Every structure is written in structure tokens, then in C-alpha cells.
Swiss-Prot record:
Binding sites annotated in the UniProt record for Zn(2+) 2: C12, C39, C42, C49
Principal place of residence: nucleus
Database matches in InterPro entries: AtrR-like, Zn2-C6_fun-type_DNA-bd_sf, Zn2Cys6_DnaBD
Annotated DNA-binding residue span(s): 12-49
Name of the protein in question: Regulatory protein alcR
Binding-site positions, Zn(2+) 1: C12, C15, C22, C39
Source species: Emericella nidulans (strain FGSC A4 / ATCC 38163 / CBS 112.46 / NRRL 194 / M139) (Aspergillus nidulans)
């Protein structure tokens, strides 16, 4: 009887990938004795035939001691080997740093890790995704270099040693892809499991669970290669463990960067649209502690699951899978930015093959996420919105021709950066959802009866339509749930904050205008009961504005709320003096959280000035806008600048999370001040104002450039004194983020802009000081400029833009020094 199995199952990997007929011999034992084990295609194209590897494994098996062939013996052998391998994985040892148990990246990784990220979607469960996997395209870009990622797997991991040659990407997909598709529940479970103990990336229990999973050994029942089933099962276990560990590492990086920053930037206390702006909920206080969660990502997924009526329809099964895939790939692309090299320092010297392999991984992850987001542009989903926001913060890999074509000047690099497009897409969708949510709230409020004396009560007896009392309207889950309402408010405020910063940096128009970003109320304007409408002359009623209507988001709202801190016991705000270090941890966290919207307000004022300048506003309007902007700047200088200076002076004494928060916040603030100086210079140059601001421009630029250089110096101080010393941030953060505090920054381009702008300003000052006799001042300026360049070199490990700008600045600084000497 003829063999009914598919001929493709008899083919080697290269022939199956190339869809060629494989003429490998059927009697492989005889062929091995005759020395013919490769098919003609592999011989012709000089490929490594799979049957070469199989023959070598069979030869090793013949030389080993004979084993029993009974089913019981095979089962015992199969189950004992994974347990032995699991025992070789080191158990995390407790130390004074409580560091995550991640191995050093310089340990040699097994050969089977090659190409593991050739298709980034394999890190998650996308076996039946609506978006094509493009596995064959991914196979063409596979690199032969060793995989440089820190997988938390020791180099002598015995499960992978049996493979002398790596499998092709197609074979990797067959091993790595599980039999089910992603959904919101899987994502939430994955996020919650990852954040149960942020200090752990992997543990031996997870390995034992993988080893005991009976599904891993299903290959033993396959009719193909029964004598090598043990090897294939062990390889499957190793790959599955590597995939799980890779996922945990990437999720850990996302957690330690994005969610860490959002726990400070985005709270119910500093969100103007939140119902709980007067106090900080206990859950948010816990988010400031050492064990924070993936709060926003989890809440966005939960909101998306119950927002059917808000979007107007339910998502189809394919749309749900596409949304989950887009969010997963956005997180993968975001986390893939951070280098995994063991070498430390700004002058990183990485072998060319490893550097090329890592760049290929980053490029593939970025392209996969971009394609997934392009396929989901028409899907009304909060997961897609959040994925666009995350991806807009992700730096792409620049090709060599792109680097030479755009040059290294910061303005050219920003002009060609396409990241704002994804952020604008997210903000337009958020704005649409907010409009729908406001309508739903008004419909819910409409069921309440108006007070006596109103139009409704006057005509109640004439136009009233009876309704069954038993059919009481049901509130929508989003409207009824305080958590979902708060999540929607936080999402909208997150989009507004990023839109404001992006518009100021890239000099692009705002997606959501000042009027559309005001606080909206579902309740109609209150009308006094004693003032009914005069039906004779239709005199409009007097309206009593609510507290929210008195609050202008871009007025002095944040300046008033920042003067008080939340009192958690009475759920009120109490007046507090400006925070100074040393202080309690919670006081420091609350001060930084309250300062965040003030920073956003300055960016908004800068954007308003840019808009007025573009529209050709009158000198009086421009001057009034300038004074409003300077009022915000002076408020920060009096309220928060002393605390920031304390943090810079005591950087190494600060808790790790306070370090990460203040460095990012201070860098953002000084960039806004330098952008303000640019706008004022444009106003003076074009003679749009009757007042000359040249002295103010000079002071703003120099003061803030020096402040940025001091920020870089404080962050780099530990590396200068002891390059091998572990950073205090090593206690709570993934080791890819711990070398210097500003590596935690999720929005890399903002700090690139800040450090680069400060360095360019200091370079210009070198021309002025170099003409004088103040040698000490010249040397100090040169040193400060060098601090900014070194900070950019560190950021260049995850951003080509930073590396290019650092090289350009270094050439400029060397030229200035040569001319001075």
C-alpha cells in the first residue's frame, strides 16, 4: 500500500522552504552507509541539508549505550531529561540589591536561539491572526549571527546542545506557535502574571511547569522520525522556554519604562478630567511603591472589552485578533529598542555581527508593528489607540542611506520622523470616543426630572408621554463603572499631553484644540429654581456656572491645584509648602506627579505662541500670550525648581524610582524653556512685537542649557567614578535600563531633543567665550557640552537619531577646541 503521507513531510527544511521537490533517499540508513545523505538541491545550492544533521544524531545514538525500546522506558527517559535540564537553571540568589535574576549577556547562548525573533509575532500567541504572518519574508532576513538578547538562560543549557545547526524560521514557527489565537483575556492574564512580582523575570517553577506540560511531548506520537522523538521533544521544550523567557524580558522592559513613567505622569490626582482630582486613590499610592503593575495596559484592555455601545457595534472575531496583535507587536517593538549587550559605557564597542543581528531584530519588530497598526486603522478599539501611542514613542532603525541622506542635524532628523502620525491617529480616535461618551452621559442624565418652574414642568401636562415604569433604562457599563470612566479620562489626558509635547517639538498643529480639550460636564447648566422662564418676553434665565465650568485647563487650573497636595485620610487637598529634599518618599512622588501637568501647560503655552505667530496675530495679543507663558515659567521656578536642584545635587542618594521620574521630568521642562526662547527669537526677528526680548532669550537658553548639562552630569557621575559599580536602579529595573537613570525614558526623542539643544547652545557660547580671556569659563562650557554629548551617546544605544546627533556634536566640539588651541 502506498504511503499516504504528504511528500512534503519527506523533504528537508531548505526544500520545504523553497517549495522544491526533495530527492532525499527513502532508506536513510543505507544512504548513510553509502555516504549519500544530502539531497541534490542542497548539494547544488551549498545548503546544510536536514538529513546531514539527522545522520549525525543517529551516529551518536549508535555509539551510546543501548536503551530499552519499551514505551515505559521511553516515557521515563523523556520525563527525566527535562527535569535534569531544569535543575541546571540557576535559582536566583537574594542579595542586598534584590536584583532580577537575569544572566549576564556575555554568556554564550545556545545556537538554537538564532532567528528566534525573525518573526516578532512568534513571541505571543498569533497562530490564527487575521494579519498575514509573512513567514517566508521573515525567513529571508534571518541573520546567522548569535542571538544577542538576554534570555535569562545559562549558556550551558543542556536542552539546546543537541542541535548543531539552527532550524529555519519556518521550523521555528512550527515549534513556537501555539494552537490558539490571542484575545483580551490572554493579554490581561499575561500582564497580571508579569507584574505579580516585578523583581522576577523567570523562575524554576515556570521551567518545571513547561517541562511537565504533556502537550510538549506530542511529537513522540508523530510517525516522522520516531527514533529522534526525544531530541525533538527536548528541543521543543527548550524553544518554548526561550519563547516564554523572551516574552517576560520584553514585557519587563515595557513595564519598567512605560508603566513606570505613567505611574507618575498619569494619575487620578493630576488628570483634569478625572472625577477624583481632589485626592489620590489608595491604588494609585500603591503604584508609587516598589511593586507597580502594568496598570494602564490592563485597564485599557478591560475598557475595550466593555465598550461595545461606546463604539456602536461589537468587534468581529478577526478585528479582536487584529487589535490584540497590534498591541502585542507595539509592545515588542517598543521594548526591543533597549540594547541587551553586557558591555557598558557610552563608547560601546560591539562586534559587527552582533550589532547587525540586533539591528535586524529591531527593524523587523518595528516593521511588523507598523504593518499591524496599518491593518487596524479602521478598527474602533482602545487597544489599537494605546498601541498607536506606544508605537509613536518607538524609535525606528535608520538605514545607512537614510543616515547619509538626512544628515545629522537635529532639525532634519525631526523633520523626517514619522512618529507623530501614529500619535495623531490615536488622538483623533480618542477625541471621537470622548464625544460619544459625553453623549451617553447626557442621555443618562436626561432621565432626571428638571426642577419646578422649568419649561419641562410648564408643559408636562400637555406633552408628557407615559412610559412603562417597569422599563427603567439601564446605564452603559462604561458610564456606570467608575474605573472605566476614569480609564477613559486618563486615556484622553494621556493623548492630550503627548499631543501638546509633540506639537511643540515638531512644530505641527494640535490635533485637539484648546476648546475641545476643556473639561466637559454631562450635566446641563444649572438654573435657579426661583428664576423660571418668562414666557411673555422669553427672557433667558440666569445660569449658575459649576466649578468645572470655571476651570480652564489651559488657564491657571494646574497652577492652583499644584499648590496643594492630596490628604488621603480626609480626601481633600491641603496647602503644602514647596517640597525640598530630603523629604518622605510619598512627598517626593506627589511633588513630581503634581509638577507634570505644569510642564504640559508650559508646552501648551509655547504651542499657543507658535500658533499666534503663524496666524500673524497683533503685537498686543502676542505680548499678552508671552506674559501668560512667563507666568507659568516663574511659577515652576518658585515652586519646583528648588526641589529639582536638590535632586540633581543628591542624585545617588535618591530612591531609584524618584531618580527615574525627576530626570525625565526635569529634562522635559528645560526643553520647553529652550523652545520658548526659540519662539521669542522668531517674534523679535520678524518684528511682530514692540518689545525686544533678546536679553530674555539669552538668559532662557543659557540657564536651561546649563541645567540640562548638570542633569546629564549627575546621571553620569556614578559611571565616571566607578564604571563597574551597579547603579541603585538595579534594584527595581531591568538591567538594560539601569546603567544611567535617563535610559528609563520611554519617549526617547524628547530627551534627545533636550540634550542636543543644550549642547548646540553651549557650542554657540564657546565662540563667544573663546574670544575673551575667561579660560575657566571656556573650559567649563566645553565640559558641560561634553556631558550632553555623552548622554546622547548612551541614548544612541537604543536610538540611531541620538547616535547621529552625538557624532555631529562631537565633530563640532572638536572643531571648536582645535580652533581655540
Amino acid at each position: 500500500m502506498a504511503d499516504t503521507r504528504r511528500r512534503q513531510n519527506h523533504s528537508c527544511d531548505p526544500c520545504r522552504k523553497g517549495k522544491r521537490r526533495c530527492d532525499a533517499p527513502e532508506n536513510r540508513n543505507e544512504a548513510n552507509e553509502n555516504g549519500w545523505v544530502s539531497c541534490s538541491n542542497c548539494k547544488r545550492w551549498n545548503k546544510d541539508c536536514t538529513f546531514n544533521w539527522l545522520s549525525s544524531q543517529r551516529s551518536k545514538a549508535k555509539g551510546a549505550a543501548p536503551r530499552a525500546r519499551t514505551k515505559k522506558a521511553r516515557t521515563a527517559t523523556t520525563t527525566s531529561e527535562p527535569s535534569t535540564s531544569a535543575a541546571t537553571i540557576p535559582t536566583p540568589e537574594s542579595d542586598n540589591h534584590d536584583a532580577p535574576p537575569v544572566i549576564n549577556s556575555h554568556d554564550a547562548l545556545p545556537s538554537w536561539t538564532q532567528g528566534l525573533l525573525s518573526h516578532p509575532g512568534d513571541l505571543f500567541d498569533f497562530s490564527h491572526s487575521a494579519i498575514p504572518a509573512n513567514a517566508e519574508d521573515a525567513a529571508n532576513v534571518q541573520s546567522d549571527a548569535p542571538f544577542p538578547w538576554d534570555l535569562a538562560i545559562p549558556g550551558d543549557f543542556s536542552m539546546g546542545q543537541q542541535l548543531e545547526k539552527p532550524l529555519s524560521p519556518l521550523s521555528f514557527q512550527a515549534v513556537l506557535l501555539p494552537p490558539h489565537s490571542p484575545n483580551t483575556d490572554d493579554l490581561i492574564r499575561e500582564l497580571e502574571e508579569q507584574t505579580t512580582d516585578p523583581d522576577s523575570v523567570t523562575d524554576t517553577n515556570s521551567v518545571q511547569q513547561v517541562a511537565q506540560d504533556g502537550s510538549l511531548w506530542s511529537d513522540r506520537q508523530s510517525p516522522l522520525l520516531p527514533e529522534n522523538s526525544l531530541c525533538m521533544a527536548s528541543d521543543s521544550t527548550a524553544r518554548r522556554y526561550a519563547r516564554s523567557t523572551m516574552t517576560k524580558n520584553l514585557m519587563r522592559i515595557y513595564h519598567d519604562s512605560m508603566e513606570n513613567a505613567l505611574s507618575c505622569w498619569l494619575t487620578e490626582h493630576n488628570c483634569p478630567y478625572s472625577d477624583q482630582i481632589s485626592y489620590l486613590p489608595p491604588k494609585q499610592r500603591a503604584e508609587w511603591g516598589p511593586n507597580w503593575s502594568n496598570r494602564m495596559c490592563i485597564r485599557v484592555c478591560r475598557l475595550d472589552r466593555v465598550s461595545t455601545s461606546l463604539r456602536g457595534r461589537a468587534l468581529s472575531a478577526e478585528e479582536d485578533k487584529a487589535a490584540a496583535r497590534a498591541l502585542h507587536l507595539a509592545i515588542v517593538a517598543f521594548a526591543s529598542q533597549w540594547t541587551q549587550h553586557a558591555q557598558r559605557g557610552a563608547g560601546l564597542n560591539v562586534p559587527a555581527d552582533i550589532a547587525a543581528d540586533e539591528r535586524s531584530i529591531r527593524r523587523n519588530a518595528w516593521n511588523e508593528a507598523r504593518h499591524a497598526l496599518q491593518h487596524t486603522t479602521g478598527i474602533p478599539s482602545f487597544r489599537v489607540i494605546f498601541a498607536n501611542i506606544i508605537f509613536s514613542l518607538t524609535q525606528s532603525v535608520l538605514d545607512d542611506d537614510e543616515q547619509h541622506g538626512m544628515g545629522a542635524r537635529l532639525d532634519k532628523l525631526l523633520e523626517n520622523d514619522g512618529a507623530p502620525v501614529f500619535l495623531e491617529t490615536a488622538n483623533r480616535q480618542l477625541y471621537t470616543f470622548r464625544h460619544k461618551f459625553a453623549r451617553m452621559q447626557r442621555r443618562g442624565k436626561a432621565f432626571n426630572r428638571l426642577p419646578g418652574g422649568s419649561v419641562a414642568s410648564t408643559f408636562a401636562g400637555i406633552f408628557e408621554t407615559p412610559t412603562p415604569s417597569s422599563e427603567s433604562p439601564q446605564l452603559d457599563p462604561v458610564v456606570a463603572s467608575e474605573e472605566h470612566r476614569s480609564t477613559l479620562s486618563l486615556m484622553f489626558w494621556l493623548g492630550i499631553m503627548f499631543d501638546t509635547l509633540s506639537a511643540a517639538m515638531y512644530q505641527r498643529p494640535l490635533v485637539v484644540s484648546d476648546e475641545d480639550s476643556q473639561i466637559s460636564s454631562a450635566s446641563p447648566p444649572r438654573r435657579g429654581a426661583e428664576t423660571p422662564i418668562n414666557l411673555d418676553c422669553w427672557e433667558p434665565p440666569r445660569q449658575v456656572p459649576s466649578n468645572q465650568e470655571k476651570s480652564d485647563v489651559w488657564g491657571d487650573l494646574f497652577l492652583r491645584t499644584s499648590d496643594s497636595l492630596p490628604d488621603h485620610e480626609s480626601h481633600t487637598q491641603i496647602s503644602q509648602p514647596a517640597a525640598r529634599w530630603p523629604c518622605t518618599y510619598e512627598q517626593a512622588a506627589a511633588a513630581l506627579s503634581s509638577a507634570t501637568p505644569v510642564k504640559v501647560l508650559l508646552y501648551r503655552r509655547v504651542t499657543q505662541l507658535q500658533t499666534l505667530l503663524y496666524r500673524g496675530a497683533s503685537p498686543a495679543r502676542l505680548e499678552a500670550a508671552i506674559q501668560r507663558t512667563l507666568y507659568v515659567y516663574n511659577h515652576w521656578t518658585a515652586k519646583y525648581q528648588p526641589f529639582m536642584q536638590d535632586c540633581v545635587a543628591n542624585h545617588e542618594l535618591l530612591p531609584s524610582r524618584i531618580q527615574s521620574w525627576y530626570v525625565i521630568l526635569d529634562g522635559h521642562w528645560h526643553l520647553a524653556a529652550m523652545l520658548l526662547a526659540d519662539v521669542l527669537e522668531s517674534i523679535d526677528r520678524d518684528s511682530y512685537s514692540d518689545i525686544n526680548h533678546i536679553d530674555l532669550v539669552t538668559k532662557l537658553r543659557l540657564d536651561n542649557a546649563l541645567a540640562v548639562s548638570a542633569l546629564a552630569r549627575s546621571s553620569l557621575r556614578g559611571q565616571e567614578l566607578d564604571p563597574g559599580k551597579a547603579s541603585p536602579m538595579y534594584r527595581h529595573f531591568h538591567d538594560s535600563l539601569t546603567e544611567v537613570a535617563f535610559l528609563v525614558e520611554p519617549w526617547t526623542v524628547v530627551l534627545i531633543h533636550s540634550f542636543a539643544k543644550a549642547a548646540y547652545i553651549l557650542l554657540d557660547c564657546l565662540d563667544l567665550d573663546g574670544q575673551g580671556n575667561a579660560l575657566a569659563g571656556y573650559l567649563q562650557l566645553r565640559q558641560n557640552c561634553n556631558y550632553c554629548i555623552r548622554a546622547l551617546q548612551f541614548l544612541g544605544r537604543k536610538s540611531d537619531m541620538a547616535a547621529l546627533v552625538a557624532k555631529d556634536l562631537e565633530r563640532g566640539l572638536n572643531g571648536k577646541v582645535d580652533s581655540f588651541l
